[in-house]
Amino acid sequence: RSIMSIKKQFLWINIIGGLSVLGGYVYALIDHPVLRAQIWGGVPETWQPWITMFMFISGFGYCYGMYYLIFNEGLNLKFFGGKYEASIMRTLLILFLVSASMWIHSTFNYLELPNAKSWNMIRIELWCTALSILFMTVGLATAKGIKNIKVHKLSVVGLGIISFHCLVFDAILWTSNFPTDF
């Protein structure tokens, strides 16, 4: 496959996956007006505005990282110390977007009918989301063949920000504070 083909794949994966994630959030929040306030779980109210602000910063970081990969030299690189082609990043991207699109629906299912199986599914989804974007960040940070060092570093920072958010705020903080009733 040519580089142009992988670029188109990345673009379409982001369009479809991004719409699935964001559209899924909108649908889930509109569909559950009574439970909507409970989606924060036990995260302290004073932290919520800061985490919300960081969500937008994380989204920008993700978009910058994807810009570099799709429209700059990113997909021409050899990832994870020069050992892998862009196809590994495509796999991680799909895993990231699929798992990111699932957790909110699983959470509302759990809020409606709390049980250990649903709770474990949420945790698996959040950890898959966090680890897949973290591995993308590591893959990009350790890539070989970089020509535009400044843009590369900024894209690593961008993916690092969303990795931090998904790992620390979602997979660790949110799951640690969410009340479980089983």
Give short role names for the model-derived ranges.
Residues 5-8, 39-49, 80-87, 117-120, ...:
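Juxtamembrane loop-transmembrane helix junctions in multi-pass integral membrane proteins
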Residues 132-182:
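Terminal transmembrane helical module of multi-pass membrane proteins
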Residues 17-33, 168-172:
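Alpha-helical transmembrane segments of multi-pass membrane proteins
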Residues 30-48, 107-121, 174-182:
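Membrane-interface interhelical loops and short amphipathic "cap" helices
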Residues 23-32, 56-81, 139-140:
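Internal transmembrane alpha-helix with an interfacial aromatic "cap," most often the third helix
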